[in-house]
A protein has these predicted regions:
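Gram-positive cell-envelope targeting signals
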Residues: 1-56, 233, 418-432
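Interdomain regulatory linker/hinge segments that flank or connect interaction modules
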Residues: 2, 14-18, 23, 27-29, ...
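Serine endopeptidase catalytic core focused on the charge-relay Asp
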Residues: 15, 210-389, 393, 402-403, ...
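Short extracytoplasmic
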Residues: 46-75
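Conserved PDZ fold ligand-binding element
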Residues: 69-77, 156-177, 400-403, 407-408, ...
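PDZ domains, with a preference for the canonical peptide-binding region formed by the helix
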Residues: 82-93, 168-201, 417-419, 423-428
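PDZ-domain C-terminal substructure recognizer with occasional recognition of PDZ-binding tails
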Residues: 100-118, 181-221
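PDZ/PDZ-like domain micro-motif
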Residues: 144-165, 396
């Protein structure tokens, strides 16, 4: 009996040891996987030193050809060992792929290497007014309403969902939410065909408007056709292409990035700043001058920011408060493999003056699931802390500079620690 119990004990013990070993390996594998980037960008004819200190090695291949290792190419090495510093140099644009192994044995992740020409952008850090028209009418809510007899109606509850976009009414494009409201009020209760877009699927639904208590025909939906606010312009290129915010325009009702048709940038004036405090984020408040000529056209709204064409004839608006006018000559960008923890600066506009303030980059997440939170930052500049309490709403898009290069842009503030926040890599913004 004792022998049998001892055998069971040994089996259980061995199983537990094996489980601990497996879990430990999975933890180590995942940890190393997250520390090695999935992509690396090199600028042509510039040495790049990579220091990851990981027990990972690999072979560099020409992209699309993984059968034969690269022997003679623009890149100076064909074997890499990420347990020590790796120096790469490329003489002309080309794409490569690194097939890696963990501990030199276990197949690991693939790393894409892109060799690109030098990129320069003009860091801005100036607040602008934003006005964007949705691509269709965004449905934010459906519900019931009563007619004059107290009978409840919900014409759209079963067929339309919050987050849907209404593109057409009876085959005709809708110009605005007022267009929809007036057309429904004049429909005399006849059934209506709505063209709906839902998660890239477009289809038609039939709905029958009903009268409300006032005798007006309604559908029982609440829609939006635009978004507006104040944000920070991150950069402008030499050709006038711009990026701003560092994150997309999000509708708070549906917590999703808006699909936009078009929009504009306008001049804005910050009238006041409410300092951030623990538990309460600060914010910039101001006015947008919609009546004046637009500064630029908004063309795209992505997860990483808003993008479009800036009117280069109106660069004086961006220059008026800029302390360092030499920034207009352009600045190189820092790719994520160049960025490191430590001192950096944020370029933002406070009291109509655009200047640098000190921050630190505390953590870098090379493979962040949320690209808007690829860096964790802390405001260390005493003057900025005295003026704003740290990061405030409206600063999203303020460019971050490290080692004389544009590294990223501010995106979020930590509500319980307003001196801390998150940022996006500038290379993520420049992909669009």
């Amino acid at each position: 009996m004792k022998t049998k119990a001892l055998k069971i004990y040994r089996i259980v013990l061995i199983s537990l040891v094996n489980l601990i070993v497996i879990l430990g390996f999975v933890f180590v594998y995942k940890s190393y996987y997250e520390k090695l980037p999935g992509s690396i960008i090199l600028e042509i004819k510039k040495e790049q030193v990579l220091s990851y200190n990981l027990p990972v090695s690999g072979t560099i291949y020409l992209s699309g050809d993984t059968e034969e290792a690269l022997e003679v190419s623009s890149i100076a090495v064909s074997e890499v060992d990420f347990s020590e510093e790796v120096t790469l140099f490329a003489s002309h644009p080309q794409n490569y792929i690194v097939k890696t192994k963990l501990f030199g044995v276990i197949p690991f992740k693939s790393v894409d290497i892109s060799v690109v020409d030098e990129v320069k952008i003009i860091p801005i850090g100036v607040p602008v007014g934003i006005y964007a028209n949705t691509d269709g009418l965004l449905v934010v809510q459906t519900g019931e309403f009563e007619d004059e007899n107290g009978t409840e109606h919900a014409p759209c509850t079963e067929v339309i969902c919050p987050g849907d976009y209404i593109l057409k009414l009876n085959g005709n494009p809708l110009e605005s939410k007022y267009h929809l409201v007036s057309a429904i009020e004049e429909c005399q209760g006849e059934s209506q065909i709505l063209t709906i877009e839902r998660e890239d699927n477009i289809f038609e639904v039939e709905v029958v408007p009903k009268k409300n208590e006032s005798g007006d025909y309604k559908l029982g939906i609440w829609v939006k056709d635009n978004a507006q606010g104040i944000g920070t312009l991150t950069y402008v290129t030499g050709t006038g292409r711009f990026g701003a915010l560092g994150h997309g325009i999000i509708d708070l009702d549906i917590q999703s990035v808006l699909e936009i048709n078009d929009g504009n940038l306008y001049k804005a004036e910050i009238m006041g700043i409410r300092k951030g405090q623990k538990g309460t984020p600060g914010e910039m408040s101001g006015v947008i001058f919609y009546g004046q000529d637009a500064l630029g056209d908004i063309e795209y709204n992505y997860e990483t920011g808003i993008y479009g064409q800036y009117d280069l004839e109106k660069m004086d608006y961006l220059l008026k408060g800029m302390q360092d006018k030499s920034l207009m000559e352009g600045m190189e960008i820092a790719y994520k493999n160049e960025i490191h923890t430590g001192e950096a600066q944020v370029l933002c506009t406070i009291n109509d003056v655009t200047r640098f303030y000190d921050i630190t980059i505390d953590k870098i997440f090379l493979n962040a699931e949320n690209v808007n939170k690829s860096m964790k930052i802390t405001v260390t500049d005493e003057e900025l802390l005295a003026l704003t309490g740290g990061i405030v709403q409206g600063m999203s898009g303020s460019p971050i500079i490290q080692d004389g290069k544009v590294a990223g842009a501010v995106t979020h503030v930590l509500i319980n620690n307003p001196d801390k926040g998150y940022a996006i890599f500038i290379e993520e913004m420049l992909e669009h």
